[in-house]
């Protein structure tokens, strides 16, 4: 295929698609140019079905530093593992694409997005999502798209599609919404306590904008799209399925309705193992035993899936016996740990998260050096999910994509209520340790984070709580579930996480397993989530009503002083010599910003006070008219040099020592003597003249005697 170019304008920026010039051996490839951002997307598919019980889709988002005209950091000067932003963007693209493949599709698919040039005012992630859908759509890979995504901002009551950098900084909303022509199928958002009505309108505005991008893709597919390949889907033997269902469905139904998680898992597993043992023995001599046993496992999974969904939609019975809109039992605890700067333990049913707060000087902020201009990140929220939380063994190591994603969601939810840097000049880190999990652990980490922040004395604007909503739909009828547990998440159609305060929403995240959901479902889910959020906030506020007025004794204390910008170099000294000396003497940590704000951190208030005294002395300037208690440091014929304070000296001219004539300075003063002086002049070079006699009343002039004349 020769190169073909397709052009349109979207959200005020040129959108150009090139097909047929590069990566021609991939099943499908596109170059998408949005503004000055350029993304190459290549989609490939394996020729055979993969083993395993899941669809092996891999989406990568690769940031090449040359795209922004930068050298990679580090010793190797080469791109390494994906950044957190790259990982989150890959997840953002994966989530709306995954539901668009057929049930039973098991061929491995890889979608690789490479950022070739970067424009901070034209979203490369949005371009990559567009390119991913288009590369799959024009390929022979059986993808049931297209999909597209946009960013939505909210400024002065107006919604903005794909806002630029300046607009996004001013926006009360940072929303990414994706979907098909028919419905929304992915949401990711942070918001500054916006109402459910505004959030719903933003979602609908985003979906409306998506239609334009989908229509553009359809035009391109009509010209260059390939015929879709015929691939084998995972299908079970119908006779085998009928046999197993007839014999064992009643037993599995009974096991599924055991309310307690571990007991239910044991009961269902016992039924499954019994069935597998019977059919393994029956077909032991069959050459297709492996395929038969794979089908048996798949049939049992489908039976459990169908029963859980039937109970909810028809009987309105949940696996643990709760009502459709009922939250599991809640518990909130603060000060779970000694010594740390703050801690909170939040439990919702069999899901439990411990959040631990650490405060540090601003020098500990994380420096983010990616494609965007380098910046410092003050607030970090890390999420850990050990395997023991679900009673299993497993891999331990660096955080995976899921842990990074859940940590970022909690970070967005909580950062909206943090105090400003001026109010609270600390770097803040929260670590969420999931101790038990039966669904919604990311939302438990948000609730635990709120407890830890308030217990640690961080003056947040309001408590934040999170809840996960679910959906069971047969295409005609649906049921929205409040506070989904693991089984409902696994067999359900939606995981819709909503976090916020009593005033409004601070974060949203939605993943679905069906092609999309309607505005009616979204509205109902948001309304149920608000009710549940308020119930959780009641429990949090009953435990700790507001942030404590004082930090923990172990937290670093802080004091801030302001110095003139031109005095920064005086405090730092040559090569950092002066500031290092201060730190060595007092044991504090010192941060100085470009505006002359000096922050001093220590657990010892006396050390802070001493540091302030030293710095004040370094930056202090003599002022005309002020009086100083000085020390004579050198005597010359023409006067005496005195030290006013620290490194500031002044000259007391011989004529300024006394009102009467001074013949010799050394007759009046000696080195080391303390004297009071008044500054009378500072010249343009900063040289200071002082006077002793200015502090002494001037003696009256002697009266002239009248001469007598005879």
Swiss-Prot record:
SUPFAM superfamilies: Eukaryotic type KH-domain (KH-domain type I) (SSF54791), Nucleic acid-binding proteins (SSF50249), Polynucleotide phosphorylase/guanosine pentaphosphate synthase (PNPase/GPSI), domain 3 (SSF46915), Ribonuclease PH domain 2-like (SSF55666), Ribosomal protein S5 domain 2-like (SSF54211). Its main location: cytoplasm. Residues 700-710 have a biased composition (Basic and acidic residues). It catalyses: RNA(n+1) + phosphate = RNA(n) + a ribonucleoside 5'-diphosphate. Residues 625-693 form the S1 motif domain. Residues 691-710 are annotated as: Disordered. It is found in: Cytoplasm. SMART domains: KH, S1. InterPro entries: ExoRNase_PH_dom1, ExoRNase_PH_dom2, ExoRNase_PH_dom2_sf, KH_dom, KH_dom_type_1, KH_dom_type_1_sf, NA-bd_OB-fold, PNPase. Residues 556-615 form the KH domain. PROSITE patterns: KH_TYPE_1, S1. Mg(2+) binds at residues 489, 495. GO terms for molecular function: 3'-5'-RNA exonuclease activity; magnesium ion binding; polyribonucleotide nucleotidyltransferase activity; RNA binding. It is an enzyme of class 2 (transferase). Its EC number is 2.7.7.8. Involved in mRNA degradation. Catalyzes the phosphorolysis of single-stranded polyribonucleotides processively in the 3'- to 5'-direction. Belongs to the polyribonucleotide nucleotidyltransferase family. This is Polyribonucleotide nucleotidyltransferase. It comes from Streptococcus pyogenes serotype M4 (strain MGAS10750). The lineage of its organism: Bacteria, Bacillati, Bacillota, Bacilli, Lactobacillales. The gene is pnp.
